[in-house]
């Protein structure tokens, strides 16, 4: 019997950063390992410069995701005025940039997911510096603001952290309601609006090595660069992520 910590992630907009090159800032369909643990770090009051505490959290948990609803892509376009690059000229503030005699315009775009819902499952590694109970307590009373990838993406449901004992990861997920089920119960008094979350035909699962389950055999395995190496330098290592899709029964 293993212990898992499960909690909801749902909001009108989410953004789970993918590899970004140039002006394009894409989003993964589901929360990444670094995003999930970054959210936990905020709940525990761990600041970005506290490298030792971040590494302790990294060594403590394995992360799995159940994608309850993938949502839809929303692409946001930006135009920004910037000064031309000049040697020996440094702009320390945005005000300094705008005072330049000549300004150029750059275009950028950022992807979001609207009405996406996911369930995170954490399991403890061997001899974890931080326990699942400590994380659950922090998710119940977060010390820093929690957002879903970007500061413009607040939560729309309580995290609802819950420790579950189960034989394997799939059984732990089965014991925890989907975000849509929770939202449906909250909106029963407003039948006109319903749950508001468009569901797909499949429930999708993503997990790390050593977390296979009899009812959840990998259909795909691919590398994912989202395992923290050094937060100050924004360096991440590669890990293997497994994928399994199940036809939705509800």
State what each model feature region is.
Residues 1-7:
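Charged, low-complexity intrinsically disordered regulatory segments in eukaryotic signaling
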Residues 7-9, 122:
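Short beta-strand element of the conserved SAM-dependent methyltransferase core
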Residues 9-15:
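Short polar catalytic/cofactor-binding loops
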């Amino acid at each position: 019997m293993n212990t898992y910590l499960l909690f909801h992630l749902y909001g009108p907009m989410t953004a789970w950063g993918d590899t970004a090159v140039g002006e394009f800032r894409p989003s993964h369909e589901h929360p990444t390992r670094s995003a999930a643990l970054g959210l936990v770090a905020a709940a525990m009051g761990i600041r970005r410069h506290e490298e030792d505490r971040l590494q302790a959290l990294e060594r403590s948990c394995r992360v799995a995701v159940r994608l309850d609803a993938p949502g839809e892509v929303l692409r946001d376009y930006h135009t920004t005025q910037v000064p031309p690059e000049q040697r020996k000229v440094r702009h320390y503030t945005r005000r300094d940039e705008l005072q330049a005699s000549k300004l150029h315009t750059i275009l950028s775009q950022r992807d979001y997911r609207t009405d996406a819902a996911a369930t995170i499952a954490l399991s403890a590694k061997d001899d974890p510096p931080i326990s699942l109970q400590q994380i659950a307590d922090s998710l119940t009373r977060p010390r820093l603001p929690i957002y879903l990838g970007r500061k413009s993406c607040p939560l729309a449901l309580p995290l609802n952290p819950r420790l579950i004992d189960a034989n394997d990861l799939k059984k732990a997920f089965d014991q925890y309601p989907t975000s849509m089920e929770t939202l449906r119960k909250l909106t029963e008094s407003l039948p006109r609006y319903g749950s508001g979350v468009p569901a797909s035909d499949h429930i999708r699962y993503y997990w790390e090595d050593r977390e296979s389950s009899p009812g959840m055999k990998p259909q795909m395995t691919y590398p994912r660069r989202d395992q923290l190496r050094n937060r100050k330098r924004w360096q991440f290592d590669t890990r293997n992520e497994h994928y399994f899709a199940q036809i939705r029964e509800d």
